[in-house]
Amino acid sequence: MAWLSRLALLSLLAGVCALPTNAKPLTFAVVPQQSAKKMAETWQPLIDYVSNYTGFKIDFKTAKDIPTFEANLADGKYNIAYMNPYHFVVFNESAGYRALARQRDKEIRGLLVVHKDSPIRSLDDLSGTEVAFPALAAFAATIITSAHLRMKSIAFVPRYVNSHDSVYLAVQRGFFNAGGGIVRTLNSSPDDVKQELRVLWKSKGYTPHAIATHPNMALADRQAILNALLALSNDTSKSWILKGIGFNGFIASNDSDWDDVRALGIASLSRPHL
């Protein structure tokens, strides 16, 4: 009978050892550039792929607006987060988030759009106008575009409308003369909005958004997630997942890959000196 007891104990221990590394679901947060519903539809297939590949349960998260997303990053509420280059530089320093991956063959560029019938033809024409932006700390859509206007000594009144979608809609409806955005979100905006807009200006390229992990995530778990992203990048049968988020693949990344953004002198969310 003793051997039966030992066998039962060994079976129990084997079962415990077979439990997933992450019994509690991981959170995969995406910076709120569009409506939560649209983002969930776009990103859930990627999250499902990573979850199935790693065996980790992963829940999609976003926030009602960019300031809330920033507050959650500051508090370390997300295990994995897709964040803009500015956020990564700030929260790598302040909260310890670590770079894991980024989009392959990609640089991020800010752009300014106007209504297609607008008389505005040059940046100088924006002098004295109201310009819509998603949020104060939106890297390409706000920081890069507004920095360029200031560099050219063009005075303008910034208005923050919480999302990229809201920027495009506000310009399309004539609420503001121009708005800041990025190519990907402009291309994915509704046709009836996009077709009414014209790109006035586009910036040079910077290292794109980061997929970063919480500083407390185990190295083995980071590697498993990275392996999933790299596997997806080479799985032609799943290319539709990447196409859904506008990516052509992922590459492994290090914190230093965002040194071009650090060179801009951005120190904090409250004082972007650009």
Predicted stretch roles:
Residues 26-30, 34-45, 212-213, 217-274:
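An extracytoplasmic/periplasmic, membrane-proximal ligand-sensing/linker region
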Residues 99-122, 210-214:
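Hydrophobic/proline-rich hinge and linker segments of small-molecule sensing/allosteric domains
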Residues 118, 129-220:
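Pocket-lining segment of extracytoplasmic ligand-binding domains
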Residues 26-33, 39, 124-141:
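Short loop->beta-strand "edge-of-pocket" segments that line small-molecule binding or catalytic clefts
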Residues 7-16:
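Bacterial N-terminal signal peptides
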Residues 23-87:
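Extracytoplasmic small-molecule ligand-binding "clamshell" domains
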